[in-house]
């Protein structure tokens, strides 16, 4: 088999039929990404392939940056002020050593699908690819909106602070029909959840100002959040997203909670117990709001952030210095949270992503305890980040199928900062079709292409269409 030929990742006849005849043509709903809505609105061409592929300063693809560091590249040519062409050359030298890494496949998929470049990216081919790619990047087809539209994307959900005015979402909303896709906000209240961080009090002032609420205790935090849910909902928002690096379920009385909030506002020292109390009560409030507005609550758990502290101090977060977290009992504490909220029927639609694949079976069985009322109300999210590989995707599909109803899965998301990442949906669909094809070969599911074709089309698109209520 040749590199990335028509049947790559499709290792049996049924897989080939399912992908080519059913999954490939389905539209995309990208319900979690980190695209900048201002770039979608402004719709400017990128100067060169480095700017769209690698970085704009310290904002960019930290997946690639990690590999470049492993290849011995000087930081000047990763997040620094090195020449864009030389950065691209260093990436070419890196990727030619990345056999077996998903970035090798993604890189060449993107070259083929967007630039129609079949040549392998190497140090030798890099100058030619640089020239051809940069010529194409100046055309209308390579403006952000056209890249999204040409990728058959119907919905893009960005990641937005609750204090955001959603300025660019508002500007894009009347242009949805012309664009051919929706750009919708998804609320991510990281700054509100981090009561122990410097600047928490200042953040509450910012949130209160946009919400028209003077925040001075926990009740006024909830009042402000409710207003922001109303605003995001009006703008088409249907999801929230919550990062739990670690978590312990520890509740607080109203008096204890207000005292904790006062400490946070005044930047006073907080104990681990107090931090967990605040986070638990905030999550309970957020679950109630997600239920009230019929949103989906996403949890990204068990990641270990910013391990290289000198580099974090130098260039900030999300720059490639994160790893898999190892809190062994985190699912037990999430279970306790859901047990509490089930008592008042405030369990929202939920998707769980753990960076530690050892959590997946426990999460999948926990999900089964709180299903009901909505088809596959609780979902095990697609393999995330370091698990975003053919093997990681397959493992996630296996756990989901064995513990719940995989045909109801809402499927793939890019979780990306790049407009060139949509081939990840193709990659996932190929893995999905091979997964079902192998079950056919083993005599474990019907040898019925039409029936399984319906299933893969649902996972590729239809389930997300119905589950999130974007339309």
Curated annotation (Swiss-Prot):
An annotated Gene Ontology molecular function: glucuronate isomerase activity
PANTHER family, per the entry: URONATE ISOMERASE
GO biological process: D-galacturonate catabolic process; D-glucuronate catabolic process
Lineage per the UniProt record: Bacteria, Bacillati, Bacillota, Bacilli, Lactobacillales
NCBIfam families recorded: PRK02925.1
EC numbers: 5.3.1.12
Identification of the protein by name: Uronate isomerase
Top-rank taxon: Bacteria
Protein keywords: Isomerase
Class in the EC hierarchy, top level: isomerase
Keyword Isomerase among record annotations: yes
Protein family membership: Belongs to the metallo-dependent hydrolases superfamily. Uronate isomerase family.
Species of the source: Latilactobacillus sakei subsp. sakei (strain 23K)
The reaction(s) this protein catalyses: D-glucuronate = D-fructuronate; aldehydo-D-galacturonate = keto-D-tagaturonate
Pathway as given in its UniProt record: Carbohydrate metabolism; pentose and glucuronate interconversion
């Amino acid at each position: 088999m040749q590199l990335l030929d028509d049947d790559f990742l499709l290792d049996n006849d049924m897989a080939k039929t399912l992908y080519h005849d059913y999954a490939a043509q389905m539209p995309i709903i990208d319900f979690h990404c980190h695209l900048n809505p201002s770039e979608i609105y402004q719709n400017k061409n990128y100067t060169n392939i480095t700017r769209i592929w690698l970085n704009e300063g310290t904002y960019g693809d930290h997946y690639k940056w990690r590999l470049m560091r492993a290849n011995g590249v000087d930081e000047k040519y990763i997040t620094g002020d090195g020449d864009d062409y030389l950065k691209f050359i260093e990436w070419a030298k890196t990727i030619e050593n990345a056999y077996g890494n998903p970035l090798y496949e993604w890189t060449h998929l993107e070259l083929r699908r967007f630039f129609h470049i079949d040549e392998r990216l190497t140090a030798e081919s890099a100058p030619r690819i640089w020239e051809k790619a940069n010529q194409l990047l100046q055309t209308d087809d390579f403006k952000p909106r056209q890249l999204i539209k040409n990728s058959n994307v119907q919905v893009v959900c960005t990641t937005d602070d609750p204090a955001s005015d959603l300025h660019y979402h508002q500007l894009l909303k009347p242009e949805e029909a012309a664009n051919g896709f929706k750009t919708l906000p998804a609320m991510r209240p990281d700054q509100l959840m981090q009561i122990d961080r410097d600047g928490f009090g200042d953040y509450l002032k910012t949130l209160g100002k946009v919400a028209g609420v003077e925040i001075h205790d926990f009740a006024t935090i909830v009042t402000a959040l409710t207003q922001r849910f109303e605003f995001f909902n009006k703008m088409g928002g249907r999801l929230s997203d919550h990062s739990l690096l670690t978590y312990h379920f520890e509740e607080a009385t109203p008096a204890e909670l207000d005292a904790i909030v006062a400490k946070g506002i005044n930047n006073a020292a907080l104990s681990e117990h107090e931090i967990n109390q605040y986070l638990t009560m905030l999550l309970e409030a957020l679950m109630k709001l997600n239920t009230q507005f019929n949103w989906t609550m996403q949890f990204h758990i068990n990641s270990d952030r910013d391990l290289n502290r000198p580099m974090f101090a130098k260039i900030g977060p999300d720059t490639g210095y994160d790893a898999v977290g190892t809190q062994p009992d985190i699912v037990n504490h999430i279970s306790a949270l859901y047990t509490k909220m089930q008592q008042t029927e405030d369990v929202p639609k939920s998707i769980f992503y753990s960076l530690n694949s050892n959590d997946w079976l426990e999460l999948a069985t926990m999900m089964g305890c709180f299903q009901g009322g909505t088809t596959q109300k609780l979902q095990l999210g697609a393999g995330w980040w370091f698990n975003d590989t053919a093997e990681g995707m397959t493992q996630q599909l296996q756990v989901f199928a064995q513990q719940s109803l995989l045909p109801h899965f809402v499927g793939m998301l890019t979780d990306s900062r790049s407009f060139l990442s949509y081939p990840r949906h193709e990659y996932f669909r190929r893995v999905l079709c091979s997964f079902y094809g192998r079950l056919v070969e083993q005599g474990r599911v019907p040898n019925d292409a039409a029936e399984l074709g319906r299933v893969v089309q649902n996972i590729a698109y239809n389930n997300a269409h119905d589950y999130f209520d974007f339309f």
